[in-house]
Amino acid sequence: MADPKGFMTTPRETPKRRPVDVRIQDWKEVYEPQSFEHLQKQAGRCMDCGIPFCHSGCPLGNLIPEWNDLIWRGDKVEAIDRLHATNNFPEFTGRLCPAPCETACVVAINTTSVTIKQIELRTIEEAFKDGNVVPLIADRLTGKTVAVIGSGPAGLAAAQQLTRAGHTVAVYDRADKIGGLLRYGIPEFKMEKAILDRRLDQMTK
């Protein structure tokens, strides 16, 4: 468990919006990033429930109490390992997911929920900053080639998992650039294209 009294002593704090007079000059993301130290305190609000309903609320089944505890303790390396165990692209979901896990959070029964989405986002951003997002190379190649049709988030996740299993993967898309919905359906103020390109660079190494 993280901080046993964290949910009582630490109030929920969500990221602040950038000033309007600044936002109207660009198409960058609306919210200001929160510091790692700030998110450590927010992670301490997790109760590590006996039955963590956030698991059932999360479509991916993310191991939320585990990486909340690791972030609170400052173990960023193990935290990103636990996050990547169930989520190929937390930098996408940390920005775009409507966070049903927070609605399911047990803390929310009597007070405000843990800021799970922001903790997830800061965990992956810290991992990129520290160089802890590295390709997982297969021990051996299977000699099989797999075609993935469509380069949206599902196609990219499939390609990543198949590559890790040792297959040679070719991704096809009708558009000029890879990314699908992430590139052509999500506006820049929700997720900047540089975030997608950063992950694609990591996947093609």
Region locations from a protein language model:
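Glycine-rich FAD pyrophosphate-binding loop
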Residues: 167-183
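Ferredoxin-type iron-sulfur electron-transfer modules and their immediate structural context
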Residues: 1-145, 193
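N-terminal Rossmann-like FAD-binding beta1-loop-alpha1 element of flavoenzymes
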Residues: 145-170
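Residue-level detector of alpha-helix initiation sites
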Residues: 88, 110, 152-154, 177
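Generic beta-strand/beta-sheet core signal
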Residues: 49, 149, 172-174
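N-terminal Rossmann-like dinucleotide/flavin-binding domain of flavoprotein oxidoreductases
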Residues: 80-87, 119, 182-205
